[in-house]
């Protein structure tokens, strides 16, 4: 009655001498073909979204509902999750992909044509700015700070309690 979402795990164990390595056949890696569909999350960005019925609804050992209620609620959960996801992706995926494409294209253009030339220009100009700043510091700021320091070096405070 419920929607089956689990895949059966089948493994075949053979000794190395049970088949010939020189038979001309290439044996496929079973992990590559565990799912016949295309991997739409190759970098595992959404691996934390594996949400199942047992993750949302759980009955403790001491209290259980009827088996038919549990099976029907599990089936309804899976079907509604499937249908709502498909419904939302039909109406939101294309507009959001369009907006994300425009956003990333704009950011790429700004980075390539404005930000990086500005940074490179600043890096080219910085050595001369550094020389000018060092001269201004040595000529104006250093003597001023030295004079203020000498003025305040003769100040002494004495605290007396009355």
Curated annotation (Swiss-Prot):
Phosphorylated on serine and tyrosine residues. CAV1 promotes phosphorylation on Ser-23 which then targets the complex to the plasma membrane, lipid rafts and caveolae. Phosphorylation on Ser-36 appears to modulate mitosis in endothelial cells. Phosphorylation on both Tyr-19 and Tyr-27 is required for insulin-induced 'Ser-727' phosphorylation of STAT3 and its activation. Phosphorylation on Tyr-19 is required for insulin-induced phosphorylation of MAPK1 and DNA binding of STAT3. Tyrosine phosphorylation is induced by both EGF and insulin (By. similarity). Residues 1-86, 108-162 are cytoplasmic. One of its GO terms (molecular function) is protein heterodimerization activity. The modification Phosphoserine is found at residues 20, 23, 36. The keyword Disulfide bond does not apply. It is a peripheral membrane protein. InterPro entries: Caveolin (IPR001612), Caveolin_CS (IPR018361). GO terms for cellular component: acrosomal membrane; caveola; caveolar macromolecular signaling complex; cytoplasmic vesicle; focal adhesion; Golgi apparatus; Golgi membrane; nucleus. The modification Phosphotyrosine is found at residues 19, 27. Residues 87-107 dip into the membrane without crossing it. One of its GO terms (biological process) is vesicle docking. It comes from the Eukaryota. It is found in: Nucleus; Cytoplasm; Golgi apparatus membrane; Cell membrane. Coiled coil: none annotated. Its main location: nucleus. Keywords: Cell membrane, Cytoplasm, Golgi apparatus, Membrane, Nucleus, Phosphoprotein. Belongs to the caveolin family. May act as a scaffolding protein within caveolar membranes. Interacts directly with G-protein alpha subunits and can functionally regulate their activity. Acts as an accessory protein in conjunction with CAV1 in targeting to lipid rafts and driving caveolae formation. The Ser-36 phosphorylated form has a role in modulating mitosis in endothelial cells. Positive regulator of cellular mitogenesis of the MAPK signaling pathway. Required for the insulin-stimulated nuclear translocation and activation of MAPK1 and STAT3, and the subsequent regulation of cell cycle progression. Monomer or homodimer. Interacts with CAV1; the interaction forms a stable heterooligomeric complex that is required for targeting to lipid rafts and for caveolae formation. Tyrosine phosphorylated forms do not form heterooligomers with the Tyr-19-phosphorylated form existing as a monomer or dimer, and the Tyr-27-form as a monomer only. Interacts (tyrosine phosphorylated form) with the SH2 domain-containing proteins, RASA1, NCK1 and SRC. Interacts (tyrosine phosphorylated form) with INSR, the interaction (Tyr-27-phosphorylated form) is increased on insulin stimulation. PANTHER family: CAVEOLIN, CAVEOLIN-2. This is Caveolin-2. It comes from Gorilla gorilla gorilla (Western lowland gorilla).
């Amino acid at each position: 009655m419920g929607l089956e979402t689990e895949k059966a795990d089948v493994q075949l164990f053979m000794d190395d001498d049970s088949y010939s390595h020189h038979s001309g056949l290439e044996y496929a890696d079973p992990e590559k073909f565990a799912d016949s569909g295309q991997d739409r999350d190759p970098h595992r960005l959404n691996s934390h979204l594996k949400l199942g019925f047992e993750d949302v609804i759980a009955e403790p050992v001491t209290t259980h509902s009827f088996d038919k209620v549990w099976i029907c609620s599990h089936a309804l959960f899976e079907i509604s999750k499937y249908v709502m996801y498909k419904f939302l992706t039909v109406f939101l995926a294309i507009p959001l992909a369009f907006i994300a494409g425009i956003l990333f294209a704009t950011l790429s253009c700004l980075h390539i044509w404005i930000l990086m030339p500005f940074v490179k220009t600043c890096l080219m100009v910085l050595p001369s700015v550094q020389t000018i700043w060092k001269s201004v510091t040595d000529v104006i700021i250093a003597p001023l700070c030295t004079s203020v320091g000498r003025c305040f070096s003769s100040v002494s405070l004495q605290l007396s309690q009355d």
